[in-house]
Every structure is written in structure tokens, then in C-alpha cells.
Amino acid sequence: MNASKFKQAIKNKASELGFFYCGFSKVAFLEEEAPRLETWLKNNYQGSMSYMANHFDKRLNPKLLVDDANTVISLLLNYHTETQQTDPLAPKISKYAYGEDYHFVIKDKLNELLSFMKQEIGAIEGRVFVDSAPVMDKVWAQKAGLGWMGKNTNLIHPKEGSFFFIAEIITDLVIEEDGPMKDYCGTCTKCIDACPTEAIVAPYVVDGSKCISHLTIELKDAVLPDQFRGKMDNWMFGCDVCQDVCPWNKFGKINNEKRFQPSAQLLDLNQNDWEDLEQETFQALFKNSAVKRTKFEGLKRNISFLK
């Protein structure tokens, strides 16, 4: 099987596994991203996410993560849904956390894809990534032609919008790159205008310390900063505002991944149920969920802050 057939076989298998899109980019040092990342960190836009300052060189050079790396295979897995929590007054959870933790779901699919590659192609080296190492996934996905970086810093695909997870396989296999996609945000500033905490401080620049997702998930302080009281738009875990207002998301298809579907119990909890939430219910609801990241105490803190 020649290189072009390898490429198509990988794309076909990725589609079979449920990935919406699969693209290829050539491994190289991310020269353009280096000063941007350095400035972002100097401005302390990482907030409490101190790990973002770690492994600076590895973030910019995949060869430091995978020996003899030649190609980044980027993949998109859709989580878009029109399902909503029943009570409009209930504290809100980001769509990506409605179902099973995406790390588990995607890693299973990536490992199956990598096994397929080794079976079909032979002795190759490869490593799978889904938020599990310092990889600039949106940058590589853009280079692979899977979308462009929106002004909210989310990757946007013209046919699917931005409600998808990004994952990678970095491999020593040499495959022709697909080439980057043009930016189609134009003069639109809907995401910037809609952000409840004004976290998008400039087009393509997010101050993570102001982002509701950071505040409700990453920030481990016992009390949330008072400057954000009344500005959280009733979000208790994550935030979808900058994606909900993005015009490109009107093209997004509904995901059909069974493991991403929310339980009826989760959707039906009302405002009082959430305020009275007990640890036993939390453990049952979020046993295999990304919401566990904030822990019971963190979720209760967030809910209390919204009152």
C-alpha cells in the first residue's frame, strides 16, 4: 500500500470510528506560535492553570513528545446537541460534559485507529493524545485543514461549527499534509460581544483567568472572585456562550455518539435539586463524567456563587 492509499485508509477508518474529520500536517517547530504563547503566559492569561507554563518547548515541538515524529494526524469528534436541561432556571452545564468523559471515549477510538494503522502499515511508532500532554491541538488541526482559529480561540469548521473535541496521533509515518484552512471570521465579533465576563480581551486572545470555564472548573479556590458575581450567566460547569452565538454553529450536525448522551436524571434536575445536591447523587450522576474534575465541593461552590 503506497503513502496516498495509507492516507485514505486512515481517513476511512477514522470515519468508521465516528470521527467527523481527519487531517494531516507535517511535524515542525511552531515558530509563529512561540511568541504568541510566550506573550499569553507573560500576561498571566493562564490564570490558575500553572501547568500551561510547563513544557514550553514540548508544546511547540512534537519531536520532543514522539521520537522521529513526522506527521500529526488531527481528528474531530462532534459533541453538538440541541438537548437542554428541562428547567430554564437550573444552573447550566456545558454541552461537552453532558455524557461520559470525552477523554475515555476518544482514547478508546484513537487506540483502535492506531492499532489499525500498525496492522495495515507495519512497524510504525505513534502516540495518541486527547488533552493528555502539552500538544497545541487547535494549531495542528488548523494546519491539517480541519478549520480555522476563531476569535474566541475555538477551532471552527465551515460545515460543523465548533462543537467538537480535537485529538491527535503523532507518528513517525510520513504522509502528505493537507494544508491549512483560511480564516472566515471576517468582521464578526459576536463571541467577543457576548462573553459574560469579557474574557475575550482581543480577537484571538482569551484571558483564561476571566473565562467562566476556568472559574468553574480549573480554579480551586474555596470562593470564586467577587468581581464575577452576577456575571456567570448561571453556568455551574463550563460555558458555551461564545460558541452558542457563533453563526457557524448553525451548520453543526447533532452528534450520534451514544456515550455522549445525557441521562434523563441529569436533564430533569431543577434549580432546587441542584441547590440541594448531595454527594451521593453527585457520584451517581457524574461517575464517568468530566464534571468530576471540579469535584463535589467545587460544584457546590459554583452553585452557591450563582445565587
Residue positions per predicted region:
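Auxiliary alpha/beta "docking" domains used to position bulky ligands
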Residues: 1-184, 233-234
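Iron-sulfur cluster-binding cysteine motifs and their immediate structural context
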Residues: 16, 190-216, 220, 232-259
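Alpha-helix boundary/capping detector
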Residues: 40, 99, 143-144, 221, ...
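Alpha-helical scaffold domains
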Residues: 49, 224-307
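Conserved active-site and cofactor/substrate-binding residues in soluble primary-metabolism enzymes
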Residues: 108, 164, 206, 237, ...
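Short, charged low-complexity linear segments at domain edges
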Residues: 156-180, 208-228, 278-283
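SIR2/sirtuin NAD+-dependent deacylase catalytic core
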Residues: 187
